[in-house]
Amino acid sequence: MAAGPAGIVWQTPANPPERQDYIFRDGRRYVRPYYFEFISHVKNRWAGKTIVDLFTDEFKGRPREYYVHAVKCGRLQVDDQMVHADYVVQSSQKISHFLHRHEPPVLGGDITILQNEADVVTVCKPASVPVHPCGQYRKNTVVGILQAEHGLVPLFPVHRLDRLVSGLLIFAKNADKAESFRQQIEASLLQKEYVAKVVGVFPDGEQTVNANVHFNAREGRSTAEVCDGDGKAPIGKQACTKFQRICTDGIHSIVLCKPVTGRTHQIRVHLKHIGYPIANDEVYLSENFSPRSSKGTRINRATTLACSLPSSDPDSCADLGNNDTNEDTEADEEFSIDPMCTNCPNLAPVGYDADEEALWLHCVRYTGPDWSYECPYPDWAFLDNVSRKKLKS
């Protein structure tokens, strides 16, 4: 635990997740909000800014008013010391941000352990759960949940799955085994297989898509790029995916997907490219998708909401963040409310998209030179009894 403003126990990345950290409600897994010390070091481009200007410019999830109060109350410190709002930071200084951390909820399904060997553990990852700590997620991750519920630590992810993708995940239990897997991946010795539920009747026979994948981080999605005949090489990275229809009911098809390369959103964008997008993929189903740059990222929407909070007395350290929302406030009985928190009294952080669902894309198999790991098919892959027999045969 970290030393911070008096009277509060502050967690750091060194504090492991525990089983009692989770709250289950309405089919979702929440993390009980907790006090946390975020530590960063002043980058060269930050040097010369005041502490308040720095956080206002770089961390837009909270309004400037919050950061002014945070400095005054010791929630923002430099080199473990309280400073004033006009303090100018210098390169490499340590900055601690003590805050009440709310993680986004994930779908409430269990993480099923498939195989637990001496050097390897494989699991079935539910959709919506990130593999490892990133962004707002720390405890609500596959790594965090496995540590809290099964005591599995350390774990080294052999591969990644996007947050909304479900299915097989392989972890090495030690650095040597992780390095062995890494070498096999670099030598292109692994075969990956996914299933997807797509719109329409997918063609019979193997379909191979060779189209560069260009990921636009600003828009939050990829595009498939091919040569348009003008002699210019297409942008993006070379990508190849092989597809095979497993079954169809005339409305949807279940398709086996074998990515030869591993680009961001490769399977999703290649399926869209050939006219058979994943049937519930909001990002690639429509050409009218509202990109991040036009509708605002989740963090920008959070900023807008936070800035609309009732203004507080500038001399008070206790009134900021008493946001009144429609979310069920029975959470008050399950965690402490922080008067400076811009998310309280809600369990989820401001701006969380409560409507997201599992993507119909699921990893079913990874095969190496002398090993193979598999994961059961999801319920959505069984279109009828015929498809159930095919998939289970």
Swiss-Prot record:
Record-listed E.C. numbers: 5.4.99.-
Class of this enzyme: isomerase
Catalyzed chemical reaction(s): a uridine in RNA = a pseudouridine in RNA
GO MF, any single term: RNA binding
UniProt GO BP: enzyme-directed rRNA pseudouridine synthesis
Annotated PROSITE patterns: PSI_RLU
Residue ranges constituting the S4 RNA-binding domain according to the UniProt record: 49-118
Domain of life per record: Eukaryota
RNA-binding keyword on record: yes
A Pfam family that the UniProt record links to this protein: PseudoU_synth_2
Similarity-based family: Belongs to the pseudouridine synthase RluA family.
PANTHER family assigned to the protein according to its UniProt record, in alphabetical order: MITOCHONDRIAL RNA PSEUDOURIDINE SYNTHASE, PSEUDOURIDYLATE SYNTHASE RPUSD2
Protein name, per record: RNA pseudouridine synthase 7
Native source organism of the sequence: Oryza sativa subsp. japonica
